[in-house]
């Protein structure tokens, strides 16, 4: 007898039929508008909350790249926050800021809520 399982693996923001809706982005109707609004709100939060002086305090120079990935789960909560950077301190700061993101309307595929992965590159120029 065949086994039926549900694929619960996170989907990419660009591959779901309905993207997660950041608070304040409900007014936009198209997927592209909602992606842009989502990205704008995330970027604004990072600009406001990320401690940009941290790199200088650590004696880092030049351009520092931090790659953050998180999942907006089926309930619209931010989970599985992970960052990658040469600096442990910058990685921790990026993860801290990503966890500040508010709950939102979850992404959907075929009308059903799904987990959606979002990747965010942060560039800190010192």
Region locations from a protein language model:
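Charge-biased low-complexity segments
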Residues: 1-126
């Amino acid at each position: 007898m065949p086994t039926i399982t549900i694929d619960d693996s996170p989907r990419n923001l660009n591959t779901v039929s309905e993207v997660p809706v950041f608070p304040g982005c409900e007014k936009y109707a198209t997927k592209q508008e909602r992606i842009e609004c989502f990205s704008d709100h995330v970027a604004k939060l990072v600009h406001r909350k990320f401690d940009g002086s941290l790199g200088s305090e650590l004696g880092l120079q030049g351009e520092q790249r931090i790659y953050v990935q998180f999942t907006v789960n089926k309930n619209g909560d931010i989970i599985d926050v992970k960052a990658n950077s040469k600096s442990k301190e910058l990685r921790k700061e990026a993860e801290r800021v990503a966890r500040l993101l508010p709950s939102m309307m979850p992404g959907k595929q075929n009308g059903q809520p799904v987990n959606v992965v979002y990747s965010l590159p942060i560039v800190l120029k010192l």
